[in-house]
């Protein structure tokens, strides 16, 4: 394992870099040459720091210190499964271990086995050649094994490392001694108050092997989870209302609940829901060893606040009366059962009788297996009433496909729209990639089930970003002679 030694001085906005030793610890000797060239770092007597070919004046803020030291383009030059020996502004020392493959971040305060080496190294000619005057606050030839509470310093190290490793915007880093205010802390921690297991980041200290999360920290995060949402691609934070669940850092489209989509499309105060009290009665008495179907329904209802996986109703879109159905993937994967099929069927029949344009927003994993053939019947039932709506009444139906739209929904009303619109990067398929590969024993080309690929093959009419969707729908309706109500 490679050993490296740094001296970080964060007090009064000053930072000092003393070099990296690339050989094993047992091969260290006083006065060995460091592997970092002097051209890359300049340290003058006025405590001005320059580096990475940027010869501009160095700011005194903590965040700029970190930006200059661990920029995203240079982080891999000195972080590669290394142990860093760090001394803070209080002249207390500890080691920081990074393992990129196993995603481990480890801190050790025990220096009993290293004390002899550090004493020898700090007394070497390399350090003695530097100024030892009274004004040189950085000089300390002795490194002691102290019980220093390094929580705040751990926070800054986590901030600087992970922000550089995943290229987080500098503006999010807050110069604060409060661990709860750390941006990195908020996005590493999930809403359940545990370390995100999707990336398997393990943040611990050797002293207690416990994570750095308390119930108080979790409460602070929970207070604002209705305002901010975390990107599941780059783990950045964004403001819900402004960004429409689209990550401003990587452009990733996050899932939206049915209520959020209704709020996005329907004018405020005009939404009138339909059939809200319709619930599944477990028609085939589906038996499961893991969890009974009724229990799964109850759990999904408590989690989402919905009775089933679709919301239907009427409202106005830029003043134009419309019938709208929105599926919610949070409710058992948006699966289509008897309740979903019946609610959509009733919505289409109402739109037919009232001569309303129809919008169905699809987000589903397909037919609900817990209801057997009854769920498959919904495909034919919805398609039948759509045929009357489109062919007999000559009314206008727009299908909006979001990620994911698969299975029975794709094979029925999802692809029956007069205009079929998809969101960018939406996953749209009949059978999933894994099912196809296991059945046909062939690899599915990457991106072949994405909206962009389907558009090129003529299966979609348009791909419309969320921020433009309402305006595009309004223009399409007016093109087909559906105009806003006269408000005079």
UniProtKB/Swiss-Prot annotation:
Keywords: ATP-binding, Chloroplast, Fatty acid biosynthesis, Fatty acid metabolism, Lipid biosynthesis, Lipid metabolism, Membrane, Metal-binding, Nucleotide-binding, Plastid, Transferase, Zinc, Zinc-finger. GO terms for cellular component: acetyl-CoA carboxylase complex; chloroplast membrane; chloroplast stroma. Gene3D superfamilies: 2-enoyl-CoA Hydratase, Chain A, domain 1. Binds 1 zinc ion per subunit. Residues 227-488 form the CoA carboxyltransferase N-terminal domain. Its main location: plastid. It catalyses: N(6)-carboxybiotinyl-L-lysyl-[protein] + acetyl-CoA = N(6)-biotinyl-L-lysyl-[protein] + malonyl-CoA. Acetyl-CoA carboxylase is a heterohexamer composed of biotin carboxyl carrier protein, biotin carboxylase and 2 subunits each of ACCase subunit alpha and ACCase plastid-coded subunit beta (accD). GO terms for biological process: fatty acid biosynthetic process; malonyl-CoA biosynthetic process. The keyword DNA damage does not apply. PANTHER family: ACETYL-COENZYME A CARBOXYLASE CARBOXYL TRANSFERASE SUBUNIT BETA, CHLOROPLASTIC. It comes from Arabidopsis thaliana. It comes from the Eukaryota. Zn(2+) binds at residues 231, 234, 247, 250. It is found in: Plastid, Chloroplast membrane; Plastid, Chloroplast stroma. Its cofactor is Zn(2+). Component of the acetyl coenzyme A carboxylase (ACC) complex. Biotin carboxylase (BC) catalyzes the carboxylation of biotin on its carrier protein (BCCP) and then the CO(2) group is transferred by the transcarboxylase to acetyl-CoA to form malonyl-CoA. The gene is accD. Belongs to the AccD/PCCB family. This is Acetyl-coenzyme A carboxylase carboxyl transferase subunit beta, chloroplastic. It is a peripheral membrane protein. A zinc finger (C4-type) spans 231-250. Accumulates in fatty acids synthesizing tissues such as embryos, expanding leaves, flower buds, flowers, and developing siliques.
């Amino acid at each position: 394992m490679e050993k490296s030694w740094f001296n970080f001085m964060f007090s009064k906005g000053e930072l000092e870099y003393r070099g990296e030793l690339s050989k094993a610890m047992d091969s260290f000797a006083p006065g060995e040459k460091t592997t970092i060239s002097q051209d890359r770092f300049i340290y003058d007597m006025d405590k001005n720091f320059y580096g990475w070919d940027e010869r501009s004046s160095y700011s005194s803020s903590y965040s700029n210190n970190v930006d200059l030291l661990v920029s995203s383009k240079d982080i891999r030059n000195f972080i590669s499964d290394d142990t860093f020996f760090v001394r803070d502004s209080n002249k207390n020392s500890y080691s920081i271990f990074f393992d990129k493959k196993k995603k481990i971040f480890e801190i050790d305060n025990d220096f009993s086995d290293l004390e002899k080496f550090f004493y020898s190294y700090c007394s070497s000619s390399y350090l003695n050649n530097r100024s030892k005057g009274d004004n040189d606050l950085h000089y300390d030839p002795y490194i002691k094994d102290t019980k220093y509470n390094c929580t705040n310093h751990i926070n800054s190290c986590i901030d600087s490392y992970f922000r550089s490793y995943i290229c987080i915007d500098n503006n999010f880093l807050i110069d604060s001694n409060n661990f709860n205010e750390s941006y990195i802390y908020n996005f590493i921690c999930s809403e359940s108050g545990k370390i995100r297991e999707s990336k398997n980041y393990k943040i611990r200290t050797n002293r207690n092997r416990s994570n750095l999360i308390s119930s108080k920290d979790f409460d602070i995060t929970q207070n604002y989870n209705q305002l901010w949402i975390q990107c599941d691609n780059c783990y950045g934070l964004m403001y819900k209302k402004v960004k429409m669940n689209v990550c401003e850092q990587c452009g990733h489209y996050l899932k939206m609940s049915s209520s959020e989509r209704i709020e996005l499309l329907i004018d405020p105060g005009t939404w009138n829901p339909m059939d809200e009290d319709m619930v599944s009665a477990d028609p085939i008495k589906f038996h499961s060893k893991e969890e009974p179907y009724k229990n799964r329904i109850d759990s999904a209802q408590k989690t989402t606040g919905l009775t089933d996986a679709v919301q239907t109703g009427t409202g106005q879109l830029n003043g134009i009366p419309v019938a709208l159905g929105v599926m919610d993937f949070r409710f058992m994967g948006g699966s289509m059962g008897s309740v979903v099929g019946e609610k959509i069927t009733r919505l289409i029949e109402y739109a037919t009788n009232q001569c309303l344009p129809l919008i169905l927003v699809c987000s589903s994993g397909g037919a609900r297996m817990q209801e057997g053939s009854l769920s498959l019947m919904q495909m034919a039932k919805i398609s039948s009433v759509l045929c009357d709506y489109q062919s007999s009444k000559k009314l206008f139906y727009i299908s909006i496909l979001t990620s994911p739209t698969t299975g029975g929904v794709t094979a029925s009303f999802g692809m029956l729209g007069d205009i079929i619109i998809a969101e960018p990067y939406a996953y749209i398929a009949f059978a999933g990639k894994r099912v196809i590969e296991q059945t046909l024993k062939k690899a599915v080309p990457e991106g072949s089930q994405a909206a962009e690929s389907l558009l090129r093959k003529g299966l979609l009419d348009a791909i419309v970003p969320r921020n433009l969707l309402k305006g595009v729908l309004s223009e399409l309706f007016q093109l087909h002679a559906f105009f806003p109500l006269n408000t005079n």
